[in-house]
């Protein structure tokens, strides 16, 4: 009986003290859903920046993907100002 108790306590401590890393952050998951890769600081030459993963990490996706995946755009009421015509 003591052996069972000892194993149970050992199992409990190993579960509580094990290093646990949480899942992906919401921005990282969104980047992966768009077939992107989180990169530090800059994207490669053949990639476009489609968002941000974390501080200093950018979501990059190759612009030449054979099966294009539309990147969701934020809808707003912003309109560009009218340009003046030169006389």
Curated annotation (Swiss-Prot):
Residues annotated as transmembrane: none
GO CC, alphabetical: extracellular space; Golgi lumen
Entry keyword set: Antibiotic, Antimicrobial, Defensin, Disulfide bond, Secreted, Signal
Keyword RNA-binding (UniProt): no
Chief localization: secreted
Subcellular location: Secreted
Function: Has antibacterial activity.
PANTHER family in the cross-refs: BETA-DEFENSIN, BETA-DEFENSIN 109B-RELATED
Family affiliation: Belongs to the beta-defensin family.
Protein name (Swiss-Prot/TrEMBL): Beta-defensin 109
Lineage: Eukaryota, Metazoa, Chordata, Craniata, Vertebrata
Gene name as annotated: DEFB109
